[in-house]
Amino acid sequence: MKFGMGSAQACPCQVPRAASTTWVPCQICGPRERHGPRTPGGQLPGARRGPGPRRPAPLPARPPGALGSVLRPLRARPGCRPRRPHPAARCLPLRPHRPTRRHRRPGGFPLAWGSPQPAPRPAPGRSSALALAGGAAPGVARAQRPGGSGGRSHPGGPGSPRGGGTVGPGDRGPAAADGGRPQRTVRAAETRGAAAAPPLTLEGPVQSHHGTPALTQGPQSPRDGAQLGACTRPVDVRDSGGRPLPPPDTLASAGDFLCTM
C-alpha cells in the first residue's frame, strides 16, 4: 500500500509494515505523545515534530503554591556531576560558640566543656540518706571544695573565691524558698519527718503498698470477679503491728500464712 505525503497517517508507528516483518509496538500514540496526530491542542508545550526520544515537557522553575517545595525534588537534575552535601555540614564547630550564655541557674555546675564533672552517685547497695542530707558518715572526714565550705567551684557561684554571694529568692525558683538550701536537702528532711510520724492503724482489708488487691478477701463466685490464684485463707496481721505488708515476693516465700495456689 502506498500513501501520499498529505495522508492523515502522520505518526510513523501507524504506518502498516510489510506482511513479512512482525509489528513491534515501539511508540504507541497517546495523550503525551510527541509526534501524535495533528489535532488542534494535541501538542504539549515543547513537543518535537520528529520521531526522536521521548522526554517530558519542561516544568516551570518553581511551581506556584505550597507544592513547589514538594515537587521540586522530583524533577530530574542534569547529570553533570553528583550533588555534594551542604558545605555547612562540614564546618561544624568543635565546641559551642558561647558556653557561658546557656540558660542555667547560678547554683548549678557550669555546662562549659572541660569543666569538672558532678559528684558521682552513691552505690545502690549503700544507704543514700547521708548523701541526700549532706552529712558524712561517722569517722569519715568530709572533703572540702576549693570554693569554701561546701561552695561551688566555678566562678560566680555562692561560696566561690571570686564572689557570687547568696542568691535572692527570685533567682533560683522553688529551691530558694527554703532559705537557699538545695532541693535534695529539703526532700531528705521531709523524708525524715515522714518516717518519724506514727503509723496509721489498719482498718478493713489489708492491702500491700504495691497496689495488690486485698489479701483477706477470698474469691467469691465467678460473677463477682474471682481471679485464679487468689488467696482463700485470711492473712494473720496481728503480729505486723499495724504496719503495711512487705512486698508480694516476701509474702509468697512465707507459706505459713499465705496460700500457695
UniProtKB/Swiss-Prot annotation:
Question: Which InterPro entries does this chain map to?
Answer: Bbc3
Tell me the domain of life: Eukaryota
Region Disordered: list its residue ranges.
Answer: 27-261
**Comp. bias (Pro residues):** 53-63
GO CC terms on record?
mitochondrion
Q: List compositional bias (Gly residues) regions by residue number.
A: 147-171
**GO BP:** apoptotic process; execution phase of apoptosis; intrinsic apoptotic signaling pathway in response to endoplasmic reticulum stress; positive regulation of intrinsic apoptotic signaling pathway; positive regulation of release of cytochrome c from mitochondria; release of cytochrome c from mitochondria
Q: Where is the composition biased (Basic residues)?
A: 74-87, 95-106
Gene induction: Up-regulated by TP53.
UniProt lists compositionally biased (Low complexity) regions at 40-50, 64-73, 124-146, 172-197
Question: Which GO MF terms are attached to this record?
Answer: ATPase binding
Q: What is known of its domains?
A: Contrary to isoforms 1 and 2, isoforms 3 and 4 do not contain any BH3 motif.
**Name of the protein:** Bcl-2-binding component 3, isoforms 3/4
